[in-house]
């Protein structure tokens, strides 16, 4: 079974996104990339990251290395550029585990940046039992890779965006957000450089941080009989909620959207400000957004497996995030 998933995953890496030449006068639209957000592709990605090959993706394990390598291969296939000669940015977690963020740049036409991130680590294999972590957070990594593929496709068609997108697959989230803290320290220390210019990326040049954390589940809906939901947690004044509302309607996604955590100010504060990877950015004044479908009873259980996700709804969520980003880039 591992070989089957690995072969299918490699086909995604090799799958070309180049399109036939467009007729003169053709206006490139974000809709030209929608076909890349397909249920089969999302299912294949989640199946790979939850397979026994990745052993639950705990930081510092061989399974984590398999996950990192697969992410880097897809970054390369989708034209994302490494910085400092490598996609891998190594650090130690709070427990001392050797961990790596995977970082790739999709160049824009200006000198402003949007960070799009999702953590790939999970709790691993404990006492011989594999914890797959499909929703948490193979779903986020599958979404991240699909978004990278979609924006690369538009760039190949000739579309340009003002912002450079920094795609980051984060390690060490399960160890006190070690990966996102390390990413922030790279930025604060002038160590993260634009591969086009070699210029350090400063806090002031980042217009938005977008974190994708659990976007595959459907078991904790906002409203009865609406499993097709998505939450975007952000500050009202800088989260650009209107962009998501417009994207949800214009792209014909029509999800049930929420902008707080189930109506609770306290839980919204915890999930937005404390326990996910946008925290280091928020702590330093960078506008940030978190996309999530919320915690379910499957979290950190063996039942959080690839078959527990609804890939039709998952696809619609990816489309909503894609069109949201396309509007703000």
What role is predicted for each listed range?
Residues 28-36, 52-62, 90-92, 127-137, ...:
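Second-shell loop/turn segments in exported
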């Amino acid at each position: 079974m591992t070989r089957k998933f690995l072969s299918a995953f490699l086909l995604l890496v090799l799958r070309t996104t180049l399109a036939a030449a467009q007729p003169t006068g053709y206006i490139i639209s974000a809709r030209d990339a929608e076909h890349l957000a397909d249920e089969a592709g999302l299912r294949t990605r989640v199946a790979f990251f939850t397979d026994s090959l990745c052993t639950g993706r705990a930081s510092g394990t061989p399974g984590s290395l398999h996950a990192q390598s697969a992410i880097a291969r897809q970054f390369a296939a989708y034209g994302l550029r490494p910085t400092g000669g490598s996609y891998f940015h190594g650090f130690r977690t709070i427990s001392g585990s050797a961990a790596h963020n995977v970082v790739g740049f999709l160049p824009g036409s200006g000198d402003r940046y949007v960070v799009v991130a999702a953590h790939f680590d999970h709790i691993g294999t404990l006492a011989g039992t594999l914890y797959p972590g499909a929703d948490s957070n193979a779903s986020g990594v599958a979404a991240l890779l699909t978004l990278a593929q979609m924006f690369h496709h538009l760039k190949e068609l000739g579309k340009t965006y003002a912002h450079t997108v920094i795609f980051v697959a984060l390690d060490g989230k399960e160890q006190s957000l070690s990966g996102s803290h390390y990413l922030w320290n790279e930025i604060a220390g002038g160590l993260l450089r634009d591969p086009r210019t070699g210029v350090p990326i400063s806090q002031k040049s980042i217009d938005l941080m977008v974190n994708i954390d659990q976007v595959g589940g459907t078991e904790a809906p906002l409203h009865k009989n609406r499993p097709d939901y998505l939450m975007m947690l952000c500050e009202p004044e800088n989260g650009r909620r209107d962009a998501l509302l417009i994207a949800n309607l214009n792209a014909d996604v029509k999800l049930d959207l929420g902008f707080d955590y189930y109506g609770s100010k306290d839980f919204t504060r915890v999930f937005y400000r404390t326990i996910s990877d946008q925290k280091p950015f928020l702590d330093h004044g960078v506008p940030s957004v978190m996309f999530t479908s919320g915690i379910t009873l499957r979290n950190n259980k063996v039942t959080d497996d690839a078959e527990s996700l609804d890939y039709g709804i998952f696809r619609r969520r990816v489309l909503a995030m894609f069109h949201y980003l396309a509007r703000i880039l």
